[in-house]
């Protein structure tokens, strides 16, 4: 897949955490295999870029972006935005990829039944590890699950089943009225 990206030069790179984790694994293994001085320089650059990301959300760095262009070129060198969703992803992986590819990564929450439109992080939000607020096309609420002792009134962190409603929510399962009735309350 990475070889295809280098040839196709996409501007937008949506993916799932599983693929991002594989990319992370290959990149970190590649860095670890570099000779000492090269590995030191890459790690110094990563540290500087991580500091800038944590300080003010910048994913670029004037001194180190030339070095990291080799990583960008793995995806064709033209990617301006990456997105992820469908499963949780480790903050460490997201921050590493933001710094290596010098692009923001938007993390989202949604379901097939919501056309993925649950919530997304803001492109300018430097904080990783959350999926942002609700999108404009959806309402989100927590439904109490007393049998599991999950209550929306739990402090400090409310818990419950996440329920979505809005125009982006599907109308039902094709020829599966039983499953449709089960999905809506």
Sequence positions of predicted segments:
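Conserved AMP-binding/adenylate-forming
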Residues: 13, 66-185
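Conserved P-loop NTPase motor core
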Residues: 1-3, 106
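A short beta-to-alpha transition loop/helix N-cap that caps and shapes the active-site region
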Residues: 2, 22-23, 116-117
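A short local structural element in Rossmann-fold oxidoreductases
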Residues: 6, 24-25, 94, 174
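Alpha-helical "lid/cap" subdomains adjacent to substrate-binding clefts that gate access
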Residues: 8-81
């Amino acid at each position: 897949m990475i070889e295809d990206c280098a040839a196709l030069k996409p501007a937008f790179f949506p993916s799932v955490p599983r693929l991002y984790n594989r990319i992370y694994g290959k990149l970190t293994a590649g860095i670890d295999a570099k000779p000492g001085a090269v590995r030191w320089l890459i790690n110094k650059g990563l540290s500087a870029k991580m500091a800038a990301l944590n300080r003010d959300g910048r994913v670029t760095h004037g001194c180190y972006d030339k070095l990291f262009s080799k990583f960008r070129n793995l995806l064709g060198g033209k990617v301006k935005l990456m997105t992820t969703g469908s499963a949780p992803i480790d903050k460490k992986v997201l921050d590493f990829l933001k710094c290596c590819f010098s692009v923001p990564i938007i993390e989202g929450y949604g379901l097939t039944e919501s056309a993925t439109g649950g919530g997304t992080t803001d492109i300018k939000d430097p904080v990783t590890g959350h999926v942002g607020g609700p999108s404009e096309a959806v309402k989100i609420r927590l439904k109490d699950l007393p049998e599991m002792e999950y209550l929306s009134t739990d402090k400090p962190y409310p818990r419950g089943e996440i329920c979505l409603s809005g125009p982006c929510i599907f109308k039902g399962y094709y020829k599966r009225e039983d499953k449709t009735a089960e999905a809506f309350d």
